[in-house]
Amino acid sequence: MARYTGPAWKLSRRLGISLSGTGKELEKRPYAPGPHGPNQRKKLSEYGLQLQEKQKLRHMYGMTERQFRRTFDQAGKMPGKHGENFMILLEARLDNLVYRMGLARTRRAARQLVNHGHIMVDGARVDIPSYRVKPGQTISVREKSNNLVVVKEAIEVNNFVPEYLTFDADKLEATYTRHAERAELPAEINEALIVEFYSR
């Protein structure tokens, strides 16, 4: 399944979650798009709830189904809870951490920064958004890209960097000090439903 490239606001309303992280998509119309307005939602089956939860998380991180399932399978080989490990692996993606650093206002914009070669890991350019960052590695903006308008604008409005990143705003770099804990990850996601979905 290909990555969704349509209007993020429409997908956010359909899934009932802000994919941009701003919450603006749901302010005026917190219901799915369509001609029937706020009264169109039907009660979902158990399978429907599981599928919806999977789609929420997959689209939140901007992944294809193949990438998503591969990461899920990798998480299942780790010690500990499958669902929590899955969330931790998703959070360690390079494009996501660029977003968490505040260098981009959305994950989609962060993915573009990585794709276009503006991001470095431990001093080497990495242009693979799915690159999994390891604790202790440093993420930075290429010196030639320090004055990008999109980066400057994103930093101006960002007021939160998670505790598993130590961010130096002057150098535009952060160290991924440790893996995220479940309490630091999206509370609106019930990963147990996703484990159930793939275990059917």
From Swiss-Prot:
GO terms for molecular function: rRNA binding; structural constituent of ribosome. Signal peptide: none annotated. GO terms for cellular component: small ribosomal subunit. Residues 92-152 form the S4 RNA-binding domain. Keywords: Ribonucleoprotein, Ribosomal protein, RNA-binding, rRNA-binding. Residues 22-42 are annotated as: Disordered. InterPro entries: Ribosomal_uS4, Ribosomal_uS4_bac-type, Ribosomal_uS4_CS, Ribosomal_uS4_N, S4_RNA-bd, S4_RNA-bd_sf. The keyword DNA damage does not apply. One of its GO terms (biological process) is translation. Gene3D superfamilies: Ribosomal Protein S4 Delta 41, Chain A, domain 1 (1.10.1050.10), RNA-binding S4 domain (3.10.290.10). Coiled coil: none annotated. The keyword RNA-binding applies. Belongs to the universal ribosomal protein uS4 family. One of the primary rRNA binding proteins, it binds directly to 16S rRNA where it nucleates assembly of the body of the 30S subunit. With S5 and S12 plays an important role in translational accuracy. Part of the 30S ribosomal subunit. Contacts protein S5. The interaction surface between S4 and S5 is involved in control of translational fidelity. This is Small ribosomal subunit protein uS4. It comes from Bacillus anthracis. The lineage of its organism: Bacteria, Bacillati, Bacillota, Bacilli, Bacillales.
